[in-house]
Swiss-Prot record:
It comes from Geobacillus sp. (strain WCH70). It holds the Pfam family Aldedh. Transmembrane segments: none annotated. Its EC number is 1.2.1.88. The lineage of its organism: Bacteria, Bacillati, Bacillota, Bacilli, Bacillales. It catalyses: L-glutamate 5-semialdehyde + NAD(+) + H2O = L-glutamate + NADH + 2 H(+). This is 1-pyrroline-5-carboxylate dehydrogenase.
Length: 515
């Protein structure tokens, strides 16, 4: 008997036992730093001379692991293995596939702090952010397993006298999963298991900044009983391995999470039909956002300020859902801005391994350079209220940065920065605020802080984002509670952690029998 789904509780680190357990997990992870990790193709460990070196973004000299790097030849080998495995994996009972997810979730739950501690080191996540990432990975496994059990017999359709009609779902084929570094466990695991539980085989190309956590998860799936060849772990260059697999005639679908530019490139390439290809590839893409929090004159201003700070600076603003635009009605603009600046100045930036750190580093040198360039642009486009400094001598640290009086069409109000930078703009009234909120090419998340029911209802209709929050921040969607995914250039309108997500990984078949 499968229990009803409930999200995984977050760890309370004010409890000393939990704090000690996490410190022990950090020591365990530190003892394993610098190891070599192979590719996994058909269950075989394959070692290459060329490596992806994963480093700690809070301490550039600390190597997390050296991961073998796939090339085109190994990608082709993995494709052949996955294509062959699909023939029998697609016929495995959905109940058996769901059971593997349940077992994997149980394994991760037992090793929860270990996975979180690894993300503290590999992704630079503070304790709470890492803990939430692991909890979300567990949630995806638990939720998608249950969703597959709901979908396994299809959906009832009508039948006439003397006729029986059945409508059910079958797997697609080989899926290429290209996962991001910002949720290196949750999104990587979620996109992978959604593909697997629906009966597809997977080539997993994790982000080059965070490949070790993906390897550890591949090991978990093996331990949970996933047969060899169903999941193949092949980190490598996007330009070499990524393009090759997106173009491959045997690739049936691509599940991508990452930047707008790479998403567009994948979407374009996947549309081309190559010799030997007998289907149109499907692309499931989540591509980022330029997310705003709107504050009305009838808002709880303390709640507004705290929501902006948490959403803008949690995990250094490196979330596609992060608040990078604060759109404040002019009546309360100065009060909200000044309180946000006060709160921002109180944030502790430092090594995420220290429990008291609110904000750690950004992920790597190129991210650091890009964000610092945007801060320079911001100094021209707005009034720097706090932050603006960076230090990449030891790790990639940037102070949380607030710009005021920014034009709604300015670059820092329109372009995704993916760092700890929030821009404030003033709206004449609530209607004007909504107009500004909708004036980007994205449509992922947004929030409205207001006590005015009519304004909330207006926003419900008119604020064009996939995830809209009232009287809270715009980050932190929970699997099964707030299905996640956006509109416009934020992706293909898919909703991860939602009731229709698995269907994107399957195709429907109708069988009609006369008697």
């Amino acid at each position: 008997m499968v229990q009803p789904y409930k999200h995984e509780p977050l760890t309370d680190f004010t409890v000393e036992a939990n704090r000690k357990a996490f410190e022990e997990a950090l020591k365990k992870v530190e003892a394993e730093l610098g190891k070599d990790y192979p590719l996994i193709i058909g269950g075989e460990r394959v070692t290459t001379d060329e490596k992806i070196v994963s480093i700690n973004p809070a301490n550039k000299t600390e190597v997390i692991g050296r991961v073998s790097k796939a090339n085109k030849e190994l990608a082709e080998k993995a494709m052949k293995v996955a294509d062959e495995a699909f023939k029998w994996w697609s016929k495995t009972k959905p109940e058996a596939r769901a059971d593997i997810l349940f077992r994997a979730a149980a394994i991760v739950r037992r090793r929860k702090h270990e996975f979180s501690a690894l993300m503290v080191k590999e992704a630079g996540k503070p304790w709470k952010e890492a803990d939430a990432d692991t909890a979300e990975a567990i949630d995806f496994m638990e939720y998608y397993a249950r969703q597959m059990l709901k979908l396994k017999d299809g959906v009832p359709v009508e039948s006439r006298p003397g006729e029986t009609n059945r409508f059910f779902y079958i797997p697609l084929g080989v899926g290429v999963v290209i996962s991001p570094w910002n949720f290196p466990f949750a999104i990587m695991a979620g996109t992978t298991v959604a593909s697997l539980v629906t009966g597809n085989t997977v080539l997993l190309k994790p982000a080059s900044a965070t490949p070790v956590v993906a390897y550890k998860f591949a090991e978990v799936l093996e331990e949970a009983g996933l047969p060899a060849g169903v999941l193949n772990y092949i980190p490598g260059s996007g330009a070499e391995v990524g393009d090759y697999l997106v173009d491959h005639p045997r690739t049936r679908f691509i599940s991508f999470t990452g930047s707008r530019d790479v998403g567009i490139r994948i979407y374009e390439r996947a549309a081309k039909v190559h010799p030997g290809q007998i289907w149109l590839k499907r692309v499931i893409a989540e591509m980022g956002g330029k997310d705003g929090i709107v504050v009305d004159k009838e808002a709880d201003l303390e709640l507004a300020a705290q929501s902006i700070v948490a959403s803008a600076f949690g995990f250094s603003g490196q979330k596609c859902s992060a608040c990078s635009r604060a759109i404040i009605v002019e009546d309360v603009y100065d009060q909200v801005l000044n309180r946000v600046v006060e709160l921002t100045k109180q944030l502790k930036v430092g090594d995420p391994a220290d429990q008291s750190t609110f904000m750690g580093p950004v992920i790597d040198q190129s991210a650091y350079n890009k964000i610092m360039e945007y801060i320079e642009i911001g100094k021209k486009e707005g009034r720097l209220m706090t932050g603006g400094e960076g230090d990449d001598s030891k790790g990639f640290f940037i102070q949380p940065t607030v710009f005021a009086d920014v034009d709604p069409n300015a670059r820092i109000m329109q372009e995704e920065i993916f760092g700890p930078v929030v821009a404030f703009t003033k709206a004449k009234d609530f209607d004007h605020a909504l107009e500004i909120a909708n004036n980007t090419e994205y449509g992922l998340t947004g929030a409205v802080i207001s006590r005015n029911r009519a304004n909330l209802e207006k926003a419900r209709e008119e604020f064009h984002v996939g995830n809209l929050y009232f009287n809270r921040g715009c980050t932190g969607a929970i699997v099964g509670y707030q299905p996640f995914g956006g509109f416009n250039m934020s992706g293909t309108d898919s909703k991860a952690g939602g009731p229709d997500y698995l269907i994107l990984h399957m195709q429907a078949k109708t069988v009609s029998e006369m008697f």
